[in-house]
Design a protein with these regions (language model features):
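Disordered, acidic Ser/Thr/Pro-rich linker "stalks" and the adjacent N-terminal cap
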Residues: 1-51, 62-65, 117-121, 597-600, ...
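Trp- and acidic/polar-enriched beta-sheet ligand-binding modules for extracellular glycan
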Residues: 38-43, 51-53, 57, 61-118, ...
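Residues within well-ordered beta-strands of beta-sheet-rich folds
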Residues: 47-49, 58-62, 97-99, 113-115, ...
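Residues at the N-termini of beta-strands
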Residues: 58, 241, 270, 411-412, ...
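N-terminal/edge-of-domain interface segments
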Residues: 63, 592-778
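Acidic, contiguous N-terminal accessory segments
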Residues: 118-233, 458-468, 472-474, 483, ...
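Substrate-binding groove of N-acetylhexosamine-processing glycoside hydrolases
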Residues: 123-136, 152, 325, 334, ...
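Feature activates predominantly on carbohydrate-active enzymes
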Residues: 196-437, 443, 712
C-alpha cells in the first residue's frame, strides 16, 4: 500500500475564496505570492483535486503571511491554529482546499504537501513496510508446505499453526507448494517471499527472518491462496529491542502471547529482561525472601515498596524454571534475550537485605547538614551500594552468574547503572571521587562479563556532563571506559532541544536510543542516520500485564516503532497520521483478538456482521448543538436488548475531558451494566484514556509534553476508533468503540444500563451499542 505524498504531480488551482473566480498568484523564485496591495484582507482558496478519494492524514501548508488559515476536505473544515506546523486532518475525501486570509502583507505559498493513503489500494498494508515489494492482484492456490531443514520445518509448523488458529483451514494439496529455505548467501536478517504461477518460497538468512517471511504470508493469505508477489526485505538497523521486567507466574502465558503476536511479527530481534529480587537465587535465597517480605509489608500498609517491585513480578518471585519458560519461548523464535541485572543503582533488592552495603546509609551516619543539602533523593538511602565492599561485590557476581546460567545470553549482559545518585560518599569512595568510582566499577563488571565471552550493555545517563547527581560532572567517564560497551542513551527526553548522543559518538561507542518512545523522540530521522547509532529499544516501566501495557499504549507503540526502526533511513514523521489510522483500523483489532484467542470474532467483524443493538436517546442543554446527533447517557436510561451476542461494542466519548496524571491509575468514568434475562448482571468499567476519550480528541495523537512519554498512546488498546469527523468550527470529533467480549454468549441480554462515577467528565455521549454474534448464538 502506498503511504506518502498524494499531490506530488498535481498542480493546484487558485480562486477567490468561496467563489469560482480564478485568482492566480505571481510566481517568483520562492514560489507563489499574492501582493498585499491587491489581496488586502481577502481570502484565497488553493485547491488540490486528488487522483481519487484518499485518507488525508497530514498537510504541510507551505504558507506564509496569512492572518487565518483553514483546511477543507470535501467541504469539511479543519481548524488550523498554527500555519507553520503540520496540520493533522484525519478525514477522507478527494478535494483538498487551503483557505488563507490576507493580513496586509504579501501572502506566500511554496506548495502544500498532502500526506495520506488510498483506502481502496489493491496492495495490502504490511508493517513494517517491506523495502522491495512487487504485487499482483492475481492469486495462486497453495497446496502444501515444503521444508528440508530444521529452521524451515519450524517456520512451516509456525505458519500451519497460525493459519489454523485464524482460519481453521490449511493447504489441501490442490495447488503449488510453498517452500521454506535458509539461504546461506543472505544476511541473517534478510528474507524474501516469492510467489509465481509455478513456484512459491520463503527464503531467509536465519530462523527469525524465516518467521518474518511467514508473518508476511499470514498478512497475504486468503482462502488458501497468495497473490503473485515478490518481497525482498531486511531492517536498516541491527538493534530493535523491547525492555520489560519479569511477570507474575500467572502472566507468563500473557508474555508468550505478547512475543508471538506483537514482538515477532513486527521485527523485534531482542528482549531486555530485567532482574531484581524477583527470581529465586540458589546462592542467596535470602534476597528473594526479603523481597517477598517487603512486598507483603507494603501491601499491608506497613512499609515502603522496594524500587522496581512493580515491574519486578509485582513484588512476587519466579523460580528459575519459570523464567526459563520465557527465555525458551524467545529462543525458539530466534529472538535474543539480554538480561538486565540491576547493579550499582536501583539495587534496593540487595541493600534491602544487606543495609550495611548501602553507600548513602553509611554516609548519613556522619554527614553534616551542609553535606546532606546536595544529596539527591536522601529519602532512598538504599539506592546505591558501595562498590568497594567486597562482600557486596561477591554477591553481585553470584547474581550475574545465576542470571547468565538461566538466560544463556548470546552477546550481552545489561548491568543497569542508571541514576546512580549516591556515589563517592563513604570514606573509601570519597577518596577516589565519584567519577573514578563509577569507572572502576563498570570496568570490573565489564571484565567479569567478558570472561564469560559476553559484552556489556548499560544505560548512559552517567556519561553525560549534564547529569550531576552527586554534585560532580562525569566529563572524563566517556574517555576512560572500554569502547565495546553498548550504551543506551535514554535521557533524551530531559533535553529535547539537544542531540545528546553527540557527546558520546566521537569516542567510538555504539549507541542505542534508550527508552525510545515513538510518540515523543525528537529529530529521529537525522539522529538515527549518524554513524554508530545502531537502533533503539521500547521500554515498559510498569507491571507486565495486558492491563498495564494497554493503559500505557505499548500495544500501539510496538508496531509504530517497528516502522521507525526497520525503515530507519526512510521513515518520515509526515506519515504519522496515516500510520496511526492504519494501525488503529487494521492492526490493533486483530492483535487484540489474537491475544484473547478470539480470532473468530475478528473474522466476523471483518465480514461486516456488526449490528446495532440499540441507542441511548437522552440529551439536554449540556450537549453542544453540533453534537446533538449523539445521545447523552443518563443513569436512568436502560437500553432494551433481548438478544444473544458474543461481543458488544460501546461507541462513546466523554462530554468533558477527565484529568490524567502520569504514574497514577487512569480515571474511572463509570460502568455499563449488562443485565441478562436470567437475572445475572455484569459490570463493564469505563475508564478515561482506557476505553474512552474526550469527544474532541484525536485518535493516537501523542500529547506533546515529554511528561507523557511513558504513556504516549493512551486510548488505543481497549477500544477502536469508530468515528472521526469535525465540528462546523473544524474541531475534531472522535468516538471510540470499547470492545467487550461477553463471558456468557449463551445467555440472552435483557438490557444495558450505565452508572456514572466521577463528576462532569463522567457524562457520556453515545452513538449506540453494536453487537457481533456468531451463528450458534442466534
Amino acid at each position: 500500500m502506498f503511504i506518502g505524498a498524494l499531490n506530488e504531480n498535481i498542480t493546484p488551482e487558485f480562486y477567490l475564496a468561496n467563489t469560482d473566480i480564478a485568482y492566480p498568484p505571481e510566481v517568483d523564485s520562492k514560489g507563489y505570492v499574492w501582493r498585499w496591495g491587491n489581496l488586502f484582507d481577502c481570502a484565497v482558496d488553493i485547491k488540490y483535486t486528488l487522483e481519487k478519494e484518499a485518507y488525508v492524514g497530514q498537510i504541510n501548508l507551505g504558507l506564509g503571511g496569512a492572518a487565518e488559515v483553514n483546511v477543507f476536505v470535501d467541504g469539511v473544515r479543519v481548524a488550523v491554529r498554527d500555519a507553520s506546523k503540520p496540520v493533522h486532518v484525519n478525514l477522507s475525501g478527494k478535494e483538498v482546499t487551503l483557505r488563507a486570509r490576507g493580513n496586509y502583507v504579501d501572502l506566500s505559498f511554496k506548495g502544500a504537501e498532502i500526506f495520506g493513503f488510498y483506502p481502496d489500494d489493491d496492495e495490502p498494508f504490511i508493517l513494517p513496510t517491506p523495502k522491495k515489494l512487487a504485487y499482483s492482484g492475481e492469486r495462486v492456490k497453495i497446496g502444501s508446505f515444503l521444508a528440508s531443514c530444521v529452521d524451515g520445518m519450524y517456520a512451516a509448523d509456525f505458519l500451519t499453526d497460525s493459519l489454523e488458529e485464524r482460519y481453521e483451514t490449511l493447504p489441501k494439496g490442490d495447488g503449488i507448494a510453498l517452500s521454506f529455505e535458509i539461504a546461506k548467501d543472505y544476511d541473517d536478517e534478510r528474507y524474501t517471499v516469492s510467489v509465481t504461477d509455478t513456484e512459491a518460497s520463503i527464503k531467509a538468512g536465519s530462523r527469525l527472518a524465516l518467521l518474518w517471511g511467514a508473518c508476511r504470508v499470514i498478512d497475504l493469505w486468503d482462502e488458501g491462496s497468495l497473490p503473485k508477489i515478490e518481497i525482498d526485505d531486511k531492517p536498516d538497523v541491527p538493534m530493535r529491542g523491547f525492555h520489560m521486567g519479569l511477570p507474575t507466574v500467572d502472566k507468563i502465558d500473557f508474555v508468550k502471547k505478547f512475543i508471538r503476536y506483537v514482538l515477532l511479527p513486527f521485527g523485534y530481534n531482542h528482549v531486555i529482561l530485567e532482574f531484581n529480587g524477583d527470581m529465586r537465587y540458589d546462592r542467596h535465597p535470602e534476597i528473594t525472601e526479603k523481597w517477598l517480605e517487603s512486598e507483603r509489608l507494603y501491601r499491608e500498609g506497613k512499609g515502603e515498596r522496594v524500587m522496581h517491585a512493580d515491574i519486578g513480578a509485582e513484588g512476587t518471585s519466579l523460580e528459575k524454571s519459570e523464567v526459563r519458560e520465557i527465555v525458551d519461548a524467545l529462543d525458539g523464535y530466534g529472538i535474543e534475550v539480554i538480561p538486565e541485572v540491576q547493579t550499582l543503582a536501583h539495587i534496593e533488592y540487595i541493600t534491602n537485605t544487606y543495609p550495611e552495603f548501602a553507600e548513602l546509609g553509611t554516609f548519613m551516619k556522619t554527614a553534616t547538614e551542609q553535606e546532606l543539602k546536595w544529596i539527591k533523593h536522601p529519602h532512598i538511602p538504599e539506592h546505591c551500594y558501595c562498590p568497594h565492599n567486597e562482600k557486596c561485590m561477591a554477591i553481585v557476581r553470584d547474581i550475574i552468574d545465576e542470571v547468565v546460567e538461566v538466560v544463556r545470553p548470546k552477546r550481552y549482559v545489561h548491568i543497569g547503572h542508571d541514576e546512580a545518585y549516591h556515589l563517592g560518599l563513604c570514606p573509601k569512595c570519597k577518596e577516589k571521587g565519584a567519577p573514578r568510582v563509577y569507572v572502576e566499577h563498570v570496568k570490573a563488571l565489564h571484565d567479569y562479563i567478558a570472561d564469560k565471552g559476553l559484552k556489556t550493555m548499560l544505560w548512559s545517563d552517567m556519561f553525560h556532563t549534564n547529569m550531576y547527581y552527586t554534585g560532580e560532572h562525569f566529563d572524563f567517564v566517556k574517555r576512560e571506559l572500554p569502547k565495546d560497551l553498548m550504551l543506551l542513551d535514554f535521557t533524551w527526553y530531559f533535553h529535547l532541544d539537544t542531540d545528546i548522543e553527540d557527546f558520546l559518538l566521537p569516542e567510538g561507542y555504539e549507541i542505542m536510543m534508550g527508552n525510545l518512545y515513538s510518540s515523543h523522540y525528537p529529530r529521529y530521522s537525522s539522529r538515527i542516520a549518524k554513524k554508530n547509532m545502531v537502533g533503539g529499544e521500547l521500554s515498559t516501566w510498569t507491571a507486565v500485564s495486558e492491563k498495564k501495557f494497554g493503559e500505557h499504549g505499548k500495544f500501539f507503540d510496538a508496531p509504530y516503532l517497528s516502522e521507525m526502526l526497520w525503515n530507519a533511513y526512510s521513515y518520515t514523521e509526515n506519515n504519522r497520521a496515516s500510520l496511526t489510522a492504519l494501525i488503529g483500523q487494521c492492526i490493533i483489532p486483530e492483535m487484540r483478538d489474537l491475544m484473547h484467542g478470539r480470532y473468530d470474532l475478528f473474522l466476523a467483524d471483518g465480514e461486516d456482521s456488526r449490528e446495532l443493538v440499540g441507542t441511548f436517546p437522552g440529551t439536554d442543554e449540556r450537549v453542544p448543538e453540533e453534537l446533538l446527533y449523539l445521545g447523552l447517557v443518563e443513569p436512568k436510561d436502560v437500553m432494551k436488548v433481548g438478544e444473544r451476542y458474543d461481543r458488544l461494542i460501546f461507541e462513546h466519548a466523554t462530554l468533558n475531558p477527565a484529568p490524567r496524571i502520569c504514574w497514577q491509575n487512569l480515571t474511572p468514568v463509570g460502568a455499563y451494566t449488562v443485565n441478562y434475562e436470567d437475572g445475572e448482571s455484569v459490570s463493564v468499567p469505563v475508564v478515561s484514556a482506557g476505553g474512552i476519550l474526550y469527544i474532541k480528541s484525536n485518535y493516537g495523537l501523542p500529547i506533546p509534553p515529554n511528561y507523557y512519554r511513558h504513556q504516549g498512546y493512551v486510548g488505543t488498546w481497549f477500544a477502536d476508533p469508530t468515528y472521526e469527523y469535525r465540528t462546523p468550527e473544524g474541531e475534531p470529533v472522535l468516538l471510540l468503540g470499547q470492545v467487550w467480549d461477553n463471558p456468557h454468549p449463551e445467555k440472552v441480554i435483557e438490557s444495558v444500563g450505565y452508572l456514572a462515577e466521577n463528576g462532569e467528565y463522567a457524562v457520556l455521549l453515545s452513538a449506540g451499542v453494536l453487537g457481533i454474534r456468531l451463528s450458534d448464538t442466534k
